[in-house]
Amino acid sequence: MRIYKIVGIVLSAMLLLASCAHSDLEEKKIKIAYANWLEGIAMSHLAKVVLEEHGYEVELQNADLAPIFVSMSGKKSDVFLDAWLPITMKDYMDQYGDSIEFLGEVYGEARVGLVVPQYVTIQSISELEANKDRFSSEIVGIDAGAGIMKTTDKAIAAYGLDGYTLMTSSSSTMLASLKKAMDKGEWIVITGWTPHWMFDQFDLKFLDDPKKVYGDLEEIHAI
């Protein structure tokens, strides 16, 4: 998986450089928006280095997802390299897509969904409600504005997970909770996605999603 991450990061920088070469950005200054997700942080910082080597002045703008799309639609940010489509960020694209241009695909085999340790004996989201006591009736998530959180709200409704609370936190807090639970051999369910190093460090699996709430494979786009 690591080699695909590297290819994606390099490709994002190349796409951005090609776009800038055909644009009329004033004074060659580019504003790159990014959220606090590892792949987005890596792609944005590498793109900054590549663009600066080609004479561009680059400003990195860190924000939550909703403000990023507002900023993109208002032309206060020029580029976002971490748009997960067609499902995860669909609501944002439906709202702001008319004012956003696609630069290209960065990574074509991304996936999002609910993730558990391999030792957890259930295989499907449809089994969660019957096992809510094992999971302390919690799905551990990330920041509230993230696309995966919006989709998980839809999954809770679609699968009748009325006994669960979707816990808002951050990526780092979620991963700390995952490690703590796995060290104790406890059951835990989190909002997860690939590419992400958690699948290299921990023995994890996606729960099957027979209703396809999370869709199939996602694509990461530069916009």
Regions found by a protein language model. Give the residues of each.
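Short helix-initiation/N-cap motifs at beta->coil->alpha
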Residues: 37-38, 59-71, 166-177
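Ligand-binding cleft/hinge of the Venus flytrap
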Residues: 47-55, 130-166
